[in-house]
A protein has these predicted regions:
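RNase H-like, metal-dependent nuclease domains and their acidic two-metal-ion catalytic environment used
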Residues: 1-114, 121, 126-129, 133, ...
Length: 164
């Protein structure tokens, strides 16, 4: 069983905020049926105060990953309960590499994205090197087609829209 929640973590530096987003992937009745398209609903946005220590961020992310709110429980073929955490994707560009180590120390499994100025996506294990233009284009298309929607009342949504 898959978990339909995905947590995205963008790590900031001294004058740049660290931000976290929770997106729910909806399939079937809650999504468009064209070309296996899924609906993406932005459920939560969080911005950590400037200069929040990275170990504290790692602890908070680990707690969120293990929370009952975002974890799905199911049973395997042996009828044993299995807890499926949300998917975690981190921006490993810049300060992301040392923070990735902190997340691994907390036994978290995640995918890393390194944003590049290149022209093609490369994958090495769980690390994806993705051109910035591809990320921006995918975001713009998802917003314009209504595939990505923000939950009402997200306090940081207007600021995020302005920054895009």
């Amino acid at each position: 069983m898959n978990n339909n929640f995905c947590i995205g973590l963008d790590l900031g530096q001294a004058s740049d905020y660290t931000a976290l987003a929770v997106v729910e992937k909806l399939e079937g009745n809650g999504a468009s049926s064209s070309r296996n398209c899924i609906a993406l609903h932005l459920r939560h946005l969080e911005r950590y105060p400037l200069r929040t220590p990275y170990p504290e961020i790692a602890e908070r992310v680990a707690a969120l990953m293990r929370s009952d709110v975002l974890t799905v429980s199911t049973t395997n073929d042996l009828l044993q309960e299995i807890r499926v955490p949300p998917e975690l994707v981190i921006d490993q560009t810049g300060v992301g590499a040392p923070v990735a180590d902190l997340l691994r120390e907390r036994d978290l499994i995640f995918r890393s994205v390194v944003i590049t100025g290149g022209d093609k996506v490369n994958r090495e294990g769980r690390v994806y090197r993705v051109p910035k233009r591809d990320l921006v284009s995918a975001l713009e298309v998802s917003l314009q087609t209504g595939v990505l929607k923000a939950a009402e009342g997200l306090e940081l949504w207007p600021a995020l829209r302005q920054e895009m």
